[in-house]
Design a protein with these regions (language model features):
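Small-residue-rich segments of transmembrane alpha-helices in multi-pass membrane proteins
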Residues: 31-37, 87-90, 149-165, 214-215, ...
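Transmembrane alpha-helical segments that form the membrane-embedded catalytic/substrate-channel core
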Residues: 61-69, 131-138, 179-196, 228-231, ...
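Juxtamembrane boundary at the C-terminal end of a transmembrane helix
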Residues: 291-303
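Multi-pass membrane catalytic core of lipid/isoprenoid biosynthesis enzymes
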Residues: 83-121, 212-236
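Interfacial loop-to-transmembrane junctions
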Residues: 95, 215, 260-288
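Intramembrane alpha-helical segments
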Residues: 96-164
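Membrane-embedded alpha-helical segments that form the functional core of polytopic membrane enzymes
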Residues: 34-75, 83, 107, 111, ...
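Cytosolic, membrane-interface loops and tails of multi-pass inner-membrane proteins
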Residues: 2-15, 73-94, 189-216
């Protein structure tokens, strides 16, 4: 009996930890932290490990807060979809009050931690949470334009790192914002495509036309092209201190060609399998792009 009780307690602890990770979307939060760190490394002259730590913690809190508030607001819709019905709130494993406390603590903690870096970083963090929770989340069931609104907080992390490093907003962080802003569309429209039926159950408008049609596929191709084009702008030396060499530009162009290949394939075949491949390709693209940008800067400094 004692062994059974210990096992039950251990299982309960694991469940609580898993629910906490899910309500804050830890994996997504860590990918956002990665973007912020990349932006910081691009903007900084001398790395401050304490600032980097604060940025990572604050960024995690910021994303966790947004996701927790999102799941509170969408709890009645999440229960309708296969992908989300087992989340902590709709499954009944976590109360709304508990989720709200987590969201509130994460919001206050995130903004406070980012403020220790500089006020501008905290301001952009607060703006990100506000837009995601107050505008993007409620608009998802009302208009396809919600993706355009959601692309704003989604594009802030890359830029946020630069602002944390420099306490300044100029053409450099603006360019980083633009790159990740355009990237959001092929990424999220691909998700909206292969999860179309599930999103439909919850009443979400995730595709620009509301349908898996030629017009949506065309827009995916167009925004994929814009993503690649904006990614190459720093090669031409017109974005202030943000610069990459032609060699890095060629690498990004190759990555862009692979990304565009999947977008064009989706335009041709219009199936869920290709949409999922495009989504995975988009994740690889933005991750490798950020690595190339950072590597380019430090290799130039060492040579």
């Amino acid at each position: 009996m004692q062994n059974l009780s210990i096992t039950q307690v251990d299982t309960a602890k694991v469940s609580v930890i898993q629910d906490f990770k899910e309500i804050t979307k830890m994996r997504l939060a860590l990918s956002v932290v990665f973007s912020s760190v990349a932006g910081y490394l691009l903007g900084v002259d001398t790395i401050s490990w304490s600032t980097l730590l604060l940025l990572s913690i604050g960024g995690y809190f910021m994303v966790g807060a947004s996701n927790a508030f999102n799941q509170i607001i969408e709890r009645d819709l999440d229960v309708l979809m296969d992908r989300t019905k087992n989340r902590p709130i709709p499954s009944g494993r976590m109360s709304v009050n508990t989720a709200f406390i987590i969201a509130a603590v994460f919001t206050i903690s995130g903004i406070s931690v980012l403020y220790f870096i500089n006020p501008q970083t905290a301001m952009f963090g607060a703006i990100s949470i506000f837009i995601y929770v107050s505008l993007y989340t409620p608009l998802k069931t009302k208009t396809p334009l919600s993706v355009f609104i959601g692309a704003i907080p989604g594009a802030i992390p890359f830029m946020l790192g630069w602002v944390a490093a420099t306490n300044d907003f100029g053409i450099e962080p603006g360019t980083l914002f633009m790159i990740q802003f355009f990237w959001q569309f092929p990424h999220f429209w691909a998700i909206g495509w292969f999860l179309f039926d599930d999103y439909k159950k919850g009443g979400f408008f995730m595709l620009p036309t509301g349908k898996k049609d030629k017009s949506t596929a065309t827009q995916i191709v167009i925004y994929t092209v814009w993503t690649v084009v904006t990614s190459l702008i720093p090669v031409f030396g017109v974005t202030g201190k943000l610069y990459i060499t032609p060699v890095s530009g060629v690498l990004i162009l190759i990555l862009g060609a692979f990304l565009l290949r999947y977008a064009i394939r989706l335009y041709k075949v219009k199936d869920a399998k290709t949409a999922k491949q495009l989504m995975l390709a988009s994740v690889s693209y933005i991750t490798l792009l950020q690595i190339i940008y950072v590597a380019d800067k430090f290799i130039r400094a060492w040579i």
